Amino acid sequence: MALDSQGIVDRLASHAMSLGIFDRVNTHEPKNAPGRGLSCAIWVQRIDPAGTLSGLSSTTGRITFNVRCYTNMLQQPEDAIDPNLLRAVDALISAYSGDFTLGGTVRNVDLLGMGGSGGLYVEAGYLNMNERIYRLMTLWVPILVNDLWDQAA
């Protein structure tokens, strides 16, 4: 299977945009602070072989994307910040679970870690950007692509 890199990024972003909960969806890691509201950014974090799913003539690849949801942590009401982010993350996981081949562009979103390095997970944290502090939740979304690299002696 050839790597449809743009197709994969487009499908990940399309799901985020279709939810109607983000004020903006970027397909890159932002260099500047976003505007107000809830933001989503998508970029590649890691690429490695999925040995347990590979054969003797080709290697299945695992491409892990960061899908980061973030919002200004100084907004009011403060008690709504984490629940709003959690709702966004839950909606994204549901969307990726419901279309785990991303429209046939990949073998599957590795929800449960069948590729050998753990499945989809979320990590919360904070980010200081342009002297503003953001609360964030980052989804680590591993994508499996069959026969990505040929093997030869």
Predicted regions and their residues:
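Charged, amphipathic alpha-helical segments and their flanking helix caps
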Residues: 1-34, 46-153
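Two-metal-ion RNase H-like nuclease active-site motif
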Residues: 42
